[in-house]
Amino acid sequence: MNPRIERKITRISGVREVKQTFLIICEGVNTEPDYFNAFRLTSANVKAVGQGMGTLSLVQKAINIKEQDKLKGRIYNQNWVVFDKDDFPENDFNSAILLARQNGFEVAYSNQAFEFWFLLHFNLYQGALHRSKYEKMLSTLLGFAYTKKSGVSSKMFNALFPKQEQAINHAKTIMKQFGGNNPAQQESSTTVYLLVEELNKFL
């Protein structure tokens, strides 16, 4: 049965629908939480929070948050961490991904930075692309100024959303070409599309 029809039948029958829950712990304090909280989900709740720390420190913090919430009776259906390679050492980045997965988290990583996911909404970029170029490129492509400090406005989210399927396809194409087990060497790439695909199931 179509999931939307199922949800409608559930509401008609008077049975309260149990929503899926997402815990999304992000490296950035503005851009990433703004973006994920902007998804208009009908059958899921999202707790996306930024911590201002990266790789191993972020994963340790995420584990602590999940455990603290569990003690309060909050258990999430999906747990995610979102972080960037930036200039962190290769071993730190790869170890953070492994530690997250060992503790029940899925990982949406970007090499070098989260904004690479935004760029893929417009074009397929292959090969190394330094993050210092992202803001200027995005401002040109969007037609209005973007800065990492400003976060994701509703105007920006609405500009990106219609191009989302293209971004997913571009990200998948890149990941297939790398095909290895060393994320720190996969420049430029992102697995943010994996989290986006999960969120899209609950639109």
Report each predicted region and the residues it spans:
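C-terminal accessory helical subdomains adjacent to catalytic cores in phosphodiester-
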Residues: 1-4, 8-23, 32-49, 68-80, ...
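Helix N-cap/beta->alpha junction signal
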Residues: 27-29
